[in-house]
Amino acid sequence: FLNPFRWVINKYREWKNKKDS
């Protein structure tokens, strides 16, 4: 499993990308 912090950043970036689109 990846570093939880990196996982959170990845999910946040994904969410932000969907929200901005």
Swiss-Prot record:
Domain of life: Eukaryota
Similarity comment: family membership: Belongs to the cationic peptide 04 (cupiennin) family. 09 subfamily.
Subcellular location: Secreted
Tissues in which the UniProt entry reports expression: Expressed by the venom gland.
Coiled coil: none
GO MF entry, a single one: toxin activity
One GO cellular component term: extracellular region
Record-annotated membrane-spanning stretches: none
Annotated keywords: Amidation, Secreted, Toxin
Signal sequence interval, chain numbering: none
Modified residues (Serine amide): 21
Name of the protein in its database record: Cupiennin-6e
